[in-house]
């Protein structure tokens, strides 16, 4: 790398349209994306070697004047035209805070700092206050699409002050994925940490839907299908249209992938450790939703599925000690006709579980918006439209969701947009859950989705009536009455005999 100079010469000063801090899994591809769009990009990374290598490699394609590297934050700032615009692409948490601290030290008044990490929306709101109190400007902006999306065009979820967004908008829109109608997959989500809030719940939905597809795969395996046969089922579902999506596509690839290191031609999934990592956004989403009083059982179960996968030694030990629980294999269909029926039931189980998960996701977003004043709800149709390309959630089911919020922004629950599908598919979902329960196949998100759909469409919950009275017995907590189907405003206590625990 000796031929690469990171010296900031006068001809380089003020030439970069945008700066990228962090040339890693996301920062490198996004830099190349912006170079493709004709922007001059300044880069900084903790490793000078990484900067030198990146500049040396890509200046051959884009020219030395288009990609500019710097060794220090001070030199990095000199490369940028004013007002400076800097995107942070480093791990969330302390690394992000360290970068912001250094940028605040070196940038000038009115310069813009954009954090693209998976940060908690409350943290983004605090950062915005801190940065803007120092005379700089701040946006929190989530990114979806992974490294490939960053390279070819991701979906972006900015949130903060509108005037700040207007300054960075041309660059972000140019780099964003484009939907089939040509619109960039980015929209201003709302105030404060709104962008990070949307990305948080985007990730929670991703957790749930990935787990639903994984549970569908495991169920099909239990029906006796191998990887290629499972691919056949998934392809037939994709061709039906409603479930066509990026997450179906990647599940299809996983199902048929052979293990290159196996001599017997077996599938890679058979040799993959059954432990799912996570970065915390799913858990945050569930915690905040529950704090706001919103039930999100499918989203919660997706988090729990990951947590249970990570305690593998405990699971293996329990498996050895508790064979009576283990020995309940999912019964394979007895005939081709029965298999066809089981697979059709599973189709509806997947469809309705995804619908239930998205319903919970958007109920949570609206409740969090109301609680924290993020001004997201009015933007939901446009936000959902940003999921259409460059985004892990992209899929055909987004269309009826977008239409539902456009036609009725106050729709009580997104489930109301799926009335016909619920009527058609609930028997299949119930039958699938019964088979899974009797066959000992864990499918927490599908089962939780059935619970959500069943509970949230009941006018009276008998179990809730019992628990309300139980609380009055032991704690005199009081209960409301039902009169003509309506809940009374006053509370009551019944006369109970003394029962000392």
Locate predicted features.
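Rossmann-fold dinucleotide-binding core
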Residues: 97-101, 114, 120-232, 240-266, ...
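NAD(P)+-binding Rossmann beta1-loop-alpha1 motif at the extreme N-terminus of oxidoreductases
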Residues: 2-78, 82-84, 106-110, 147-151
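Glycine/threonine-rich flexible loop motifs
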Residues: 85-102
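Interdomain hinge/lid region at the active-site interface
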Residues: 196, 221-225, 240-355, 403-445
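Small-residue-rich helix-loop
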Residues: 237, 241, 369-407
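C-terminal amphipathic alpha-helical interaction region
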Residues: 423, 428-501
């Amino acid at each position: 790398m000796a031929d690469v100079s990171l010296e900031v010469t006068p001809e380089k000063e003020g030439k970069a349209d945008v700066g990228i801090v962090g040339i890693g899994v996301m920062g490198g591809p996004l830099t190349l994306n912006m170079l493709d769009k004709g922007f001059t990009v300044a880069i900084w990374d903790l490793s000078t070697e990484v900067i030198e290598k990146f500049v040396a490699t890509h200046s051959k394609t884009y020219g030395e004047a288009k990609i500019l590297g710097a060794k220090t934050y001070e030199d990095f700032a000199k490369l940028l035209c004013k007002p400076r615009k800097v995107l942070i692409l480093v791990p969330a948490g302390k690394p992000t805070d360290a970068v912001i601290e250094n940028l605040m030290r070196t940038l000038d008044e009115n310069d813009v700092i954009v954090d693209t990490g998976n940060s908690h929306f409350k943290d983004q709101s605090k950062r915005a206050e801190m940065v803007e109190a120092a005379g700089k400007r701040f946006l929190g902006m989530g990114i979806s699409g992974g490294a490939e999306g960053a390279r070819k065009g991701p979906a972006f979820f900015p949130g903060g002050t509108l005037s700040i967004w207007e300054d960075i908008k041309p660059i972000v829109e140019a780099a964003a994925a484009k939907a089939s109608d040509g619109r960039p997959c980015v929209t201003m989500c709302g105030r404060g940490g709104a962008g990070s809030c949307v990305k948080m719940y985007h990730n929670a939905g991703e957790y749930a839907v990935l787990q639903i597809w994984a549970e569908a795969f495991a169920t099909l395996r239990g029906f006796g299908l191998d990887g290629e046969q499972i691919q056949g089922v998934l392809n037939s579902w994709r061709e039906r249209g409603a479930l066509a999506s990026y997450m179906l596509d990647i599940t299809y690839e996983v199902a048929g992938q052979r293990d290159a290191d196996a001599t017997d031609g077996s599938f890679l999934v058979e040799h993959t450790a059954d432990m799912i990592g996570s970065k915390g956004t799913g858990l945050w989403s569930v915690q905040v939703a529950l704090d706001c009083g919103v039930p999100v059982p499918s989203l919660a179960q997706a988090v729990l599925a990951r947590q249970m996968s990570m305690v593998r030694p405990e699971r293996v030990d329990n498996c050895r000690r508790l064979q009576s629980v283990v020995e309940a294999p999912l019964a394979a269909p007895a005939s081709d006709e029965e298999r066809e029926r089981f697979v059709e039931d599973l189709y509806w189980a997947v469809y309705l579980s995804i619908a239930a998960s998205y319903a919970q996701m958007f109920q949570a977003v609206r409740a969090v918006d109301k609680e924290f004043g993020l001004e997201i709800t009015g933007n939901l149709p446009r936000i959902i439209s940003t999921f259409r390309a460059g985004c892990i959630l992209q899929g055909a089911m987004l269309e009826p969701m977008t239409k539902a919020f456009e036609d009725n922004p106050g729709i009580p629950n997104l489930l109301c947009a799926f009335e016909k599908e619920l009527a058609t598919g609930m028997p299949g979902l119930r039958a699938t859950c019964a088979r899974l329960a009797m066959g000992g196949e864990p499918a927490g998100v599908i089962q939780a989705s059935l619970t959500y759909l069943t509970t949230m469409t009941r006018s009276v919950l008998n179990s809730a009536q019992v628990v309300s009275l139980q609380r009055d017995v032991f704690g005199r907590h009081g209960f409301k009455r039902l009169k003509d189907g309506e809940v009374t405003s006053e509370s009551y206590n019944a006369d109970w005999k003394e029962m000392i625990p």
